[in-house]
Amino acid sequence: MQQNTNVDPQEIAKFERMAETWWDLNGEFKPLHLLNPLRLNYIDQTAGGIFGKKVLDVGCGGGILSESMARIGAIVHGLDMGEEPLEVARLHALETGVSINYVKNTAEAHREDHREYYDVVTCMEMLEHVPDPLSVIQACCDMVKPGGFVFFSTINRNIKSFVETIIGAEYLLKMLPIGTHDHNKFIKPSELMALVDNTDLLCKDALGITYNPLTGIFKYTPKVDVNYMIATQKVD
């Protein structure tokens, strides 16, 4: 799939409906706010620092990760297909005085004018929401410079992830709206790495993230059985 065809309208509509709560620290996106410091630290440390680097945030939504990267000195472009989340992101950036270029586009279409343009590309919690993950991965690869880093995060597909992210997070703890995730669209680490192997990206690291509902704290874990991130680097 290419250009603007790799989009699930139902997924876009889902996040459009929740857009106004994106920056509510106790709202529907509270898990992303709690998780974000871990994501930011992992990206910054693994990429050797992102200060002054051109960074593309694919599937940026309301801009939680985009803003945090801009605040530590990255030159950030945010990409999403949801108009409402992008408007929220733009408004919040104005309110906080952060400079970010937000664009409504797919990764595949944005690639046409941005081949080997970025030092770092992030694609976090997005692959499980598109019909063709490989198409997005390939576009991310094409847009990063040789030697640059591309980061992906998603959710493993197994019984434990179903219990924790859907039964637990959506139905019991009410951390997310019911229907936020579709377990069938979750991606096993082996599947994600197999997709990466179809590109010029090399997997450099994989790291899990776990949540303790008693303390309300996310932390790193070597286990990738539920939420996980991978760091890849483009071959020179």
Swiss-Prot record:
Kind of enzyme, top EC level?
Answer: transferase
Q: Name one GO molecular function term.
A: polyprenyldihydroxybenzoate methyltransferase activity
Name of the coding gene:
ubiG
Query: Record keywords: Methyltransferase included?
Result: yes
Q: Which organism is it from?
A: Shewanella sp. (strain MR-7)
Family, per the entry? Belongs to the methyltransferase superfamily. UbiG/COQ3 family.
- The EC number on file is 2.1.1.222, 2.1.1.64
Coiled coil feature spans: none
Write down the Gene3D superfamilies for this protein, in alphabetical order: Vaccinia Virus protein VP39
Q: Name the UniProt key words of this record, in alphabetical order.
A: Methyltransferase, S-adenosyl-L-methionine, Transferase, Ubiquinone biosynthesis
This protein is called: Ubiquinone biosynthesis O-methyltransferase
Q: Which reaction does it catalyse?
A: a 3-demethylubiquinol + S-adenosyl-L-methionine = a ubiquinol + S-adenosyl-L-homocysteine + H(+); a 3-(all-trans-polyprenyl)benzene-1,2-diol + S-adenosyl-L-methionine = a 2-methoxy-6-(all-trans-polyprenyl)phenol + S-adenosyl-L-homocysteine + H(+)
A family per Pfam: Methyltransf_23
